[in-house]
Amino acid sequence: MKREGVLYILSAPSGAGKTTLCREIIDIFPQLRHSVSYTTRTPRPGEIHGKDYFFVSMDEFHRMIDADEFAEWAEVHGNCYGTSIRTLEENRAAGVDLILDIDIQGARQLQERFAGGVYIFILPPSFEELRRRLNGRSSDSDEVISRRINAAAGEIRESRWYDYIIVNDQFSRAVEELKSVIIAEQCRTARVLDAVSEIFSMD
């Protein structure tokens, strides 16, 4: 029996480093695929359509909402983000594990819709460090940075319902902790019992 693919959902305040962590962990686990979200925001320097995000107009995004094409979607800091339900269902059925880089609103929607997801919250070491990282983004205005900092406190409070919390202070350590979570989840009894039962003829 083919194992169902696992959804690894990463959320964090903007600037905590979850996108960079996602990219790094996919290099470590080649069988793990990144679920590319749709967004209405403007691409940042170096971002590639279809790899980092599917960049679409607000009209196209709302057409997809009306057509019930999203497993989850949310408006965050004035921009819309969404995950294709078809992408999730096809990959899970094929036994492909996906890593999703999404906000708290979207994570809540997925929790209600899909069982067995692994929810991981990435924290910055402090608000001061978060502000420093956001200030390093040339694409964000002072107004946007202030709005993200103000939103971070509420977002961090939501971390209590996630399965795991990783503090991204030293990046290499955060990578190792995320790697450990994925390895542990791959060994979870509920995920491997069917395969083990077939091998050892367990009743």
UniProtKB/Swiss-Prot annotation:
The lineage of its organism: Bacteria, Pseudomonadati, Thermodesulfobacteriota, Desulfuromonadia, Geobacterales. It comes from Geobacter sulfurreducens (strain ATCC 51573 / DSM 12127 / PCA). ATP binds at residues 12-19. Keywords: ATP-binding, Cytoplasm, Kinase, Nucleotide-binding, Transferase. It catalyses: GMP + ATP = GDP + ADP. SUPFAM superfamilies: P-loop containing nucleoside triphosphate hydrolases. GO terms for molecular function: ATP binding; guanylate kinase activity. PANTHER family: GUANYLATE KINASE, GUANYLATE KINASE-RELATED. Essential for recycling GMP and indirectly, cGMP. The keyword ATP-binding applies. Its EC number is 2.7.4.8. One of its GO terms (cellular component) is cytosol. Belongs to the guanylate kinase family. It is an enzyme of class 2 (transferase). It is found in: Cytoplasm. Residues 5-183 form the Guanylate kinase-like domain. This is Guanylate kinase.
